[in-house]
């Protein structure tokens, strides 16, 4: 009787619990099998590694073997960004599992287990199960973690780009130096550093000029509008007032010229001006011409005086005047 009661009171797990336990037991074996199959297809040579650019193909290969996708759309974007950072990076299986856990936010085994479970359990049971709650919490974290991861990956990508640009410039510099002089130059390294610093300075100058242009044309529209208004006003004043100002100046000049001419004419026509004030003519100011003038003037005046005295004497003798 006691045995029957104990048997009747034994715990009997439900079907869903048995399914979950079965999934737990076969999860690691199944995920390993899927990864080995995908790895054997995409591995490079016999060294047992793949390139980072092969990760999306590995995930796609495993997705075809599962009832649902292994990753979400946001996971795919993060993986793509990480792959583009260094597509030729070599990865072993352990490194792949670490990268997958970092990028997706869950381990590879758990992701495979969740993808396999989605075809067996109903949505209600799946939502109430352990994996469903884990998937929901993982989805909640996906809204925060990928954004931070993307920022970190972008910063790392920019650093690698800067390093690549630096190495490319260094290579081009040494290549040009080798073409100029095949012999080894001791100060080549210093010359490259100086040229690189000059290039950085030029880039900074260009950035400053761009910022100035943005300040002039984009970031201070009020100042720009005010400056344009002042320039337009100056242009209108120049086109409208300048011709009138020139006409007024021309009229004033003509007025002063005519007034001066009239005054000069009046002063020259007056008769009450004494003779000693009048200005001598040009031939009177010449010494030679002035002497000739006075010579002939004296001779003429002497002849006139002598002739007049003879006429007076004859007149007196005729009329008996003594």
Curated annotation (Swiss-Prot):
Localization: Nucleus membrane; Cytoplasm, Cytoskeleton, Microtubule organizing center, Spindle pole body
Highest taxon in the source lineage: Eukaryota
GO biological process: protein localization to spindle pole body; spindle pole body duplication
Record's keyword terms, sorted: Coiled coil, Cytoplasm, Cytoskeleton, Membrane, Nucleus, Transmembrane, Transmembrane helix
Coiled coil keyword on record: yes
Pfam families in alphabetical order: MPS2
GO cellular component, one term: cytoplasm
Keyword Coiled coil included in the entry's annotation: yes
Residue runs in coiled coils: 147-217
Stretches that traverse the bilayer: 245-265
Record-stated family: Belongs to the MPS2 family.
This protein's name: Monopolar spindle protein 2
Gene: MPS2
